[in-house]
Structures are given as structure tokens and as C-alpha cells.
């Protein structure tokens, strides 16, 4: 028997069907947890579940979820509950020793059940864009507005979400940052209720400690992304909202990165086509989710990512290369699709990565140098973060 509290973001029946059919995109926004004696995590890792290496291998009861009873904890949604946590890889099923319901799934140990589809490209460009439009519209509309706020940078991704929900918009950045300026402009264009957090050095120092504790990561890129996410989520929670909608995933799915546009010349990708480079970046999403979900949840709110619903993923994967990148334009199909409700000024706007658009990366560098960690040192921001947090 699978309890409702044992599985996040999907029904047990849906996950059972996905396992039986080998269906990687069964119509969910991701899932993770325990089903029929086995831990599961969706193909893109949009939810998190952890197993305790020693307890699971030692034969503790598979039902011993952290906090559930007095026995050894085998698994949890929170790695802090476990003595030796290991994140279940995306697309994997891991039967747990000692649970009769999992005996027919083989010996304990994770096995990959789902892989990201690689369909042939849609040859009808109009149909491809229409499919993206319908998928995004439905996925955003079904989010609902109860307890909802939107993380808003003023770019096409967050505006595609914000323009279709009745919820306040939140942005964090240093005064003069790209994100504050763009958010003000886009919020005015959609008549949105924008709430700004002007970040200070004290905010960074406080948030760094929180995100390192939550994520265990200290490198400059991960901290630079997690800090503004945490600060937005913290403000959202303080204002009484418990869900935070993000435009996460559009860059990875729709060809938003320069390295994808420059494939195969860009050394940051191994792929030899734009479509293959897009797939390569999409396969990196699970690692990002662990960072982002843990940082946002540490602030007390639940992240919602409608642009990563299975129906959007399926529509994106069917796009031909020319609807990902065309000349200097990126996310071609996505921009065309959401122009139905996104103002042109936002639909056409180039996006800066969160750590740069908020100026958090610049100010982390400044704080590190002020604290004696000079750029000539290898990885000076990481060293500063580790000194600040005793990591």
C-alpha cells in the first residue's frame, strides 16, 4: 500500500502505469517517493527523494521513512533526516530491501527505468509552435492562484507565467541591476503587482549561510543562483504566500543558452547539432533542481514550475533546430508561442542569468575580495563562501 504522504506530485496509479509502460512523460509535473516498496524519481528529477545508503543496504524496513516510526530511517524527502543520504538519480526506480511489495522488482539497487525521449522533429512549423502554445497555456492555467506568488525577472519565461495568473510578482536584485529594471518594465506592461527586494551585502551574507546549509554547495555559480532565489522565496513567505511559481526550464528545453546556439563550435557542449546540444542541457536539469528546490524550500515556500510539465517537455522535444535557434534569435518557438499573451517588449527581451541579472555574482566577488580572497587565488569566491559558513 502506498500512502499519500509517501509520494509527491503524482498519484501512485500514474507512477505504476509509467513504470509498466516505460513512459517517461506520463502527464505530470514530476514526482518522487515510495510506490509499492520502491523509491521512484521522474525522468527530469523535478522532485527529490533520498535513500540512506547504510540503512537501506543493511536491511532496515523499507517502510521506515524518516520521522514515520522509531526504526532506522531508510528514505526521506529531506536529506537532513538521514545519516548517509544519497539522492536517487532521475529516471530511476530503487526497490527497498525488506518490503514484500518490492520483491518482484528485483534486487535492491537503483535502475534506470525512464530516459528522456528523443523524437523526430516536427516538420510542420506552425503545428509545432501551436503545440508549444497549447502546452504552456494549459500548464500555467492549471497552477491556480491560491497562495501563489511569481518569481519575476521581466524576461519572457517569467512573464509567460505571470501574465496568466492572478498573483503578485517578486524580484530581488541590487539597485541598478538588469533584473530590477526589466521587472519594472514588464510588470507595467502586464499591469502586474511588482514587489521588489533591493539586495544588500548583509542580505547576501545571511542568505549565503542559509543556502549553503540547505544545498551543501559552495561554488560561485550555485551560490550566485541560489541566493536570489532564496531571498525572493523568503520575502514571499514573509508576505504570507506558500507557493512560488518560476519560469524555470524554458532555457534548457527551448534553446535559450548561447552554448546551444553556437553548437557544435562551443566547447561547452559535446553535441554537433543545436537539437543535440539542447538535449545535453536538458539532461543537466536534475542537478539544478536539487539546488533550486532545496534553496526555495529552506525559505518556507513550495516551488511550482509549470514550464516543466510533461506536456511542455513533450512539445519542446519535438521542435526542429530552426525553432530553437534562428540566426541571433534563441527560444524561437517559445517566443512565438507565448506572444499570444506576453507583450512584445518582454517576448523579445534577452535574458541574463539570475546570478548576473541580479548582480549577486558581482557583489559576491566584491565581498570575497574585500575579505582578502583575491581573484588571483583559484576559486576565490568558493573560498570566501566556505570561510563565511565554516563549510
Predicted stretch roles:
Residues 352-360:
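Small/polar glycine-rich anion-binding or flexible loop at a beta-alpha turn
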Residues 125-327, 331-341, 359, 363-367, ...:
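ATP-dependent adenylate-handling active sites, centered on carboxylate activation for C-N bond formation
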Residues 341-353:
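Short, surface-exposed acidic
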Residues 86-90, 374-382:
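Short glycine/proline-enriched turn or capping motifs at secondary-structure junctions
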Residues 1-195:
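Cysteine-centered catalytic environments shared across enzyme families
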Amino acid at each position: 500500500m502506498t500512502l499519500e504522504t509517501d509520494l509527491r506530485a503524482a498519484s501512485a496509479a500514474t507512477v505504476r502505469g509509467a513504470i509498466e509502460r516505460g513512459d517517461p512523460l506520463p502527464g505530470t509535473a514530476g514526482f518522487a517517493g515510495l510506490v509499492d516498496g520502491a523509491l521512484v524519481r521522474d525522468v527530469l528529477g523535478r522532485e527529490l527523494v533520498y535513500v540512506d545508503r547504510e540503512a537501506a543496504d543493511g536491511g532496515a524496513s523499507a517502510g521506515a521513512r524518516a520521522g514515520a516510526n522509531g526504526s532506522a530511517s531508510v528514505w526521506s524527502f529531506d536529506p537532513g533526516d538521514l545519516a548517509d543520504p544519497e539522492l536517487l538519480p532521475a529516471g530511476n526506480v530503487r526497490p527497498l530491501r525488506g518490503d514484500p511489495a518490492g520483491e518482484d522488482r528485483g534486487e535492491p539497487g537503483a535502475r534506470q527505468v525512464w530516459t528522456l525521449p528523443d523524437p523526430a522533429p516536427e516538420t510542420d512549423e506552425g503545428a509545432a509552435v501551436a503545440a508549444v502554445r497549447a502546452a504552456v497555456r494549459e500548464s500555467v492555467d492549471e497552477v491556480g492562484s491560491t497562495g501563489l506568488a511569481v518569481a519575476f525577472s521581466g524576461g519572457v519565461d517569467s512573464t509567460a507565467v505571470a501574465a496568466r495568473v492572478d498573483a503578485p510578482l517578486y524580484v530581488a536584485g541590487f539597485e541598478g541591476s538588469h533584473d530590477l529594471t526589466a521587472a519594472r518594465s514588464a510588470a507595467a506592461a502586464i499591469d502586474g503587482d511588482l514587489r521588489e527586494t533591493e539586495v544588500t551585502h548583509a542580505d547576501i551574507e545571511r542568505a549565503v549561510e542559509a543556502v549553503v546549509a540547505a544545498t551543501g554547495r559552495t561554488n560561485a555559480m550555485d551560490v550566485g543562483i541560489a541566493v536570489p532565489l532564496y531571498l525572493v522565496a523568503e520575502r514571499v513567505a514573509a508576505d504570507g504566500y506558500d507557493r512560488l511559481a518560476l519560469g524555470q526550464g524554458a532555457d534548457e528545453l527551448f534553446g535559450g543558452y548561447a552554448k546551444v546556439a553556437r553548437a557544435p563550435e562551443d566547447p561547452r557542449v559535446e553535441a554537433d547539432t543545436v537539437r543535440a546540444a539542447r538535449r545535453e542541457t536538458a539532461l543537466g536539469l536534475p542537478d539544478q533542481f536539487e539546488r533550486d528546490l532545496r534553496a526555495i524550500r529552506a525559505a518556507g515556500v513550495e516551488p511550482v514550475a509549470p514550464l516543466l510539465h510533461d506536456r511542455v517537455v513533450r512539445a519542446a522535444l519535438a521542435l526542429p533546430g530552426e525553432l530553437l535557434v534562428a540566426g541571433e534569435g534563441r527560444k524561437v518557438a517559445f517566443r512565438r508561442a507565448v506572444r499570444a499573451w506576453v507583450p512584445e517588449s518582454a517576448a523579445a527581451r534577452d535574458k541574463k542569468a539570475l546570478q548576473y541579472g541580479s548582480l549577486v555574482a558581482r557583489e559576491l566577488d566584491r565581498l570575497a575580495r574585500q575579505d582578502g580572497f583575491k581573484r588571483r587565488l583559484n576559486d576565490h569566491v568558493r573560498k570566501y563562501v566556505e570561510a563565511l559558513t565554516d563549510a
